[in-house]
Amino acid sequence: MIESDRIITASPFSSQEEVIERALRPVQLDDYVGQEKIREQLKIFIEAARQRQEALDHVLLFGPPGLGKTTLAHIIAREMGVNLRHTSGPVLERAGDLAALLTNLEANDVLFIDEIHRLSPVVEEILYPAMEDYQLDIMIGEGVAARSVKIDLPSFTLVGATTRAGMLTNPLRDRFGIVSRLEFYTSDELSKIVTRSAGLLDVDITADGAREIACRSRGTPRIANRLLRRVRDFAEVRANGRIDRQVADAALQMLDVDAAGLDVLDRKLLLAVLEKFGGGPVGVDNLAAAINEERDTIEEVLEPYLIQQGFLQRTPRGRMATTMTYQHFDIIPLQQAATPGLFNPD
């Protein structure tokens, strides 16, 4: 199974899903659910910048995919009353690509660069003076005839988004005045998001139905909205169109998403640790071979959520199952089963 096949992946499935996501996005900070600290900070910073009639400081948003970094970039531009230009690190292959974007910005506009950690070194070098001095240094000509030309730029706000903050160079990171880490959402926050999205999609849903979807959404709004749409399909075909807890549970079981938000691949990994390696520790290469997956898939796709939720522990000796993992699968640890009298005198 690859990441794009998983219904609980935090990455968008397709351009069609991105269109649906845009329709569900909040457009102002007051409508944005979750990330309370970031939201309050941005309210203050944006209002201060507007009062001074200045561009907002450059903003770096980082955290797991699907948590709302792109949404926040759009909200920042809307709250500032300016235009937003959207691009991504891999698209900006040459210095000229970035120069074309920068020279077309208007005063105080927002330039949003997704996957900013994937900028090439050449493009990144051009970005430094643009961020600091609102100037573009470009080389014209070649060889001995080459000369540097400075072009003044309008003041602007760069909003960078990344899931891999550790891959940013220090010089780039240091040029952001506002740095915010987005965290996984609580079930209560996701319930509000599901309820709001259901209203926009004209879906009849009860509070406990929204809660059931929220609890299995891995702390991620993008997953919550995707599950809502799939549960809606189930409700229209197998029920009366109304989503309550029972309908949501039946639909999510059909989709192989269990009560903890784990799917087939998550369970395959955890059961391998439990059954093939006695709960661990096990090295990631051995684990990858045991479940026939790539090492990168385990480290970048599966582990973050499992570790964050307490199902997996990363130690110097390898990966280990936790007490929660044994309880989730109703499996008795080997050492406990071997000495029943110690734990269960009966």
UniProtKB/Swiss-Prot annotation:
- Family (UniProt): Belongs to the RuvB family.
**Superkingdom assignment:** Bacteria
Residues noted as binding DNA in the record, renumbered to the chain? 295, 314, 319
The cellular location(s) given in this protein's UniProt record come to: Cytoplasm
Pfam families assigned: AAA_lid_4, RuvB_C, RuvB_N
Q: Indicate whether DNA damage appears among the record's keywords.
A: yes
Annotated stretches, region: Head domain (RuvB-H) = 259-346
The written remark on domains in the entry is:
Has 3 domains, the large (RuvB-L) and small ATPase (RuvB-S) domains and the C-terminal head (RuvB-H) domain. The head domain binds DNA, while the ATPase domains jointly bind ATP, ADP or are empty depending on the state of the subunit in the translocation cycle. During a single DNA translocation step the structure of each domain remains the same, but their relative positions change.
Give the species this sequence originates from. Answer: Nitrosomonas eutropha (strain DSM 101675 / C91 / Nm57)
One annotated GO biological process: DNA recombination
Region of interest called Large ATPase domain (RuvB-L), as start-end residue ranges on this chain: 4-185
Binding residues annotated for ATP, in chain numbering = 24-25, 66, 69-71, 132-134, 175, 185, 222
Give Gene Ontology CC terms.
cytoplasm; Holliday junction resolvase complex
Q: What does this protein do?
A: The RuvA-RuvB-RuvC complex processes Holliday junction (HJ) DNA during genetic recombination and DNA repair, while the RuvA-RuvB complex plays an important role in the rescue of blocked DNA replication forks via replication fork reversal (RFR). RuvA specifically binds to HJ cruciform DNA, conferring on it an open structure. The RuvB hexamer acts as an ATP-dependent pump, pulling dsDNA into and through the RuvAB complex. RuvB forms 2 homohexamers on either side of HJ DNA bound by 1 or 2 RuvA tetramers; 4 subunits per hexamer contact DNA at a time.
Output this protein's name.
Holliday junction branch migration complex subunit RuvB
